[in-house]
């Protein structure tokens, strides 16, 4: 009885991974198609599943110092659907922090955050003191961060502060569910 349960569990786990791989390929293909329709050439890209499902994916690609963030819904029995998202400028130390000493506490913190964010660091003009991990957000089309570091370029000897921005409000949950179900979003 235990062996049968273990075999069934192993089969289901393998099936889930295979379905996940197929869905990832579909989402990546849609990302490439979307960039092509925009006349963009992808420099780097990443496609990640959203919370606890294999249907709704967050697509991010880079071109000319900007990240383009979109949601891609790849239903099991439907055509893929794209929800166009936001764009955010990539943080480039030589451009956004040219006077920051290379051998400073803050420069080390920025380098560490960049490493652990796989280089997907964004900066918003209205909040230039925040470095955002673009890979994660409450909504798959948004550049509003789940977390970021707060930097003060006038104090390079001070550590950056880690800040969370989680939002589980009813409005966010409803919008996420609408994306997941493939509904029209205003």
List each language-model region with its residue ranges.
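Internal/C-terminal transmembrane anchor helices
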Residues: 2-27
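Extracytosolic and intramembrane catalytic regions of membrane-associated proteins
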Residues: 43-44, 54-186
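Alpha-helical transmembrane signal-anchor/signal-peptide segments
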Residues: 24-43
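Generic signal for short, ordered secondary-structure residues
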Residues: 10-14, 38, 95
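A short beta-turn/loop motif at secondary-structure boundaries
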Residues: 49-53
